């Protein structure tokens, strides 16, 4: 049983009219279904920021070679518009790299970014920045970030960026590419402009009770930095650990993660 002792306030938002939309923010609740949303809505006494969504749709999530998808194939479909095989990341069923929304944005002169609460070699962030036929090829996937070109990256997973078996220091390589590489929220908060690659934890970021509103802060920092481009930006934000606690059948942490994701929308 999960009980939210103090429900959080939710306001009704009115979409602006008469303005041309130039920024795109894609928010993904990893593994999140209608069940998660309704449970979180019930726990918060019938209110969610998600209720402000103007449209609702359903998608068939099967991948190219299986009925049951995974975050590799499913995330690739979201990132590129193409279905691929189970466990593949950012490539088509033949293993050829696909262009993601992040790289398409850069090509069109917009800035791009991702902000997640998981390790950066996890499938969803990798789907937008990397290319591999196997999502478990973690060291290879992480190395792809050096050349991905995305302007803002926030997440966990420092252990595969340094002290690697191949001897590469990916943080050093990223700095050589013009990135600033803060290793904590405090360091990130001080940055006022430029490209950022922030990895705060060895693997995933901490649980909500410990990290607080870190995802919301990291997302707002992305908007602040990417928004300096007058052409606009694309940003993908993921509530990454919802999926973990669904697998673990841990309703307490699952609801904490779902509410954290919902409050990030605010």
Spans of model-derived segments:
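Beta-strand elements within well-structured catalytic alpha/beta cores of enzymes
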Residues: 21-32, 105, 199, 232-240, ...
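Short, well-ordered amphipathic alpha-helical segments that serve as non-catalytic structural scaffolds
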Residues: 219-222, 260-266
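Conserved alpha-helical scaffold segments that buttress catalytic/binding sites
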Residues: 159, 175, 193-195, 205
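Generic structural signal for well-ordered alpha-helical scaffold segments
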Residues: 102, 142, 223-224, 266
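N-terminal catalytic scaffold of extracellular/periplasmic and nuclease hydrolases
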Residues: 1-164, 168-188, 259
């Amino acid at each position: 049983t999960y009980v939210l002792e103090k429900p959080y306030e939710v306001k009704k938002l009115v979409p602006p009219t008469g303005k041309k939309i130039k920024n795109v923010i894609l928010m993904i609740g990893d593994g999140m279904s209608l069940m998660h949303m309704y449970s979180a809505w019930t726990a918060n006494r019938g209110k969610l920021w998600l209720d402000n969504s103007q449209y609702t749709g359903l998608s068939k999530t099967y991948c190219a070679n299986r009925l049951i998808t995974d975050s590799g194939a499913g995330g690739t479909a979201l990132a590129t518009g193409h279905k691929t095989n189970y466990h593949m990341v950012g490539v088509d069923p033949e293993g050829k790299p696909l262009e993601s929304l992040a790289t398409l944005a850069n090509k069109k002169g917009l800035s791009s970014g991702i902000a997640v609460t998981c390790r950066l070699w996890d499938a969803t962030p990798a789907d937008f920045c990397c290319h591999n036929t196997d999502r478990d090829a973690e060291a290879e996937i992480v190395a792809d970030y050096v050349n991905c070109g995305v302007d803002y990256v926030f997440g966990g997973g420092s252990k595969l960026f340094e002290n690697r078996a191949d001897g590469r220091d990916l943080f050093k390589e990223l700095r050589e590419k013009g990135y600033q590489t803060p290793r904590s929220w405090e360091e990130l908060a001080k940055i006022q402009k430029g490209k950022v690659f922030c990895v705060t934890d060895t693997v995933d970021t901490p649980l909500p009770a410990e990290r607080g509103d870190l995802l919301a802060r990291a997302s707002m920092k992305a908007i602040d930095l990417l928004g300096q481009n007058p052409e606009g930006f694309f940003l993908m934000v993921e509530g990454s650990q919802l999926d973990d606690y669904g697998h673990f059948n841990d309703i307490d942490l699952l609801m904490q993660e779902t509410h954290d994701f919902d409050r990030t929308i605010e």
